[in-house]
UniProtKB/Swiss-Prot annotation:
<feature type="binding site">
    <location>
        <position position="70"/>
    </location>
    <ligand>
        <name>Zn(2+)</name>
    </ligand>
</feature>
<keyword id="KW-0862">Zinc</keyword>
<protein>
    <recommendedName>
        <fullName>CXXC motif containing zinc binding protein</fullName>
    </recommendedName>
</protein>
<feature type="binding site">
    <location>
        <position position="33"/>
    </location>
    <ligand>
        <name>Zn(2+)</name>
    </ligand>
</feature>
<dbReference type="InterPro" id="IPR008584">
    <property type="entry name" value="CXXC_Zn-binding_euk"/>
</dbReference>
<keyword id="KW-0479">Metal-binding</keyword>
<feature type="binding site">
    <location>
        <position position="36"/>
    </location>
    <ligand>
        <name>Zn(2+)</name>
    </ligand>
</feature>
<comment type="similarity">
    <text>Belongs to the UPF0587 family.</text>
</comment>
<dbReference type="Pfam" id="PF05907">
    <property type="entry name" value="CXXC_Zn-b_euk"/>
</dbReference>
<feature type="binding site">
    <location>
        <position position="67"/>
    </location>
    <ligand>
        <name>Zn(2+)</name>
    </ligand>
</feature>
<dbReference type="GO" id="GO:0008270">
    <property type="term" value="F:zinc ion binding"/>
</dbReference>
Length: 160
């Protein structure tokens, strides 16, 4: 079992507390089999709500799958306690926002999509359903009378 951290980096304009919103947030990942090196050609998603039992009664995971090439059963689990918001003071630096516990799988790519939420840095104005698929997002904070945005989104995986 290996833990991988998803580190996130972005430039935040007048925003803080950027985070995945809700237990149904979809983490879209590309995964590699640790046994044979096969990489999934399609994006796969996992959520905190997903729970699949592991063989042999060893607990559960967010996703269990059998490798198409070598037939090995692999799993990945979201570690709920590792979820952290990306704040204004984190802007333009890499910060771990979630960790995954992997058995036989390695996450190699992440595709941010809809489902993020944030707050206005000065006003606390909530912004929901932020879509980061284009790596940029903008809106307007009526209370502060200023633009808000998320720019230059980057990510990387590191072993914990």
């Amino acid at each position: 079992m290996v833990k991988f951290a998803l580190q996130f980096k972005a430039s935040l304009e007048n925003l803080t507390q950027l985070r995945p919103h809700g237990e149904d947030f979809r983490w879209f990942l590309k995964l590699k089999c640790g046994n044979c090196g096969e990489v999934s050609d399609k994006w796969q998603y996992i959520t905190l709500m997903d729970s699949v039992p592991l063989k042999g009664g060893r607990g559960s995971a967010s996703m269990v799958q059998r490798c198409k090439l070598c037939s090995r059963e692999n799993s990945i689990d979201i570690l709920a306690a590792s979820l952290h918001p990306y704040n204004a003071e984190d802007s333009e630096t890499f910060k771990t926002i979630v960790e995954f516990e992997c058995r036989g799988l390695e996450p190699i790519d992440f595709q941010p999509q809809a489902g993020f939420a944030a707050e206005g840095a000065e006003t606390g104005t909530p912004f929901h359903e932020i879509n980061l698929q284009e790596k940029d997002w903008t809106d307007y904070d009526e209370k502060a009378k200023e633009s808000v945005g998320i720019y230059e989104v980057e990510h990387r995986f590191t072993k914990c």
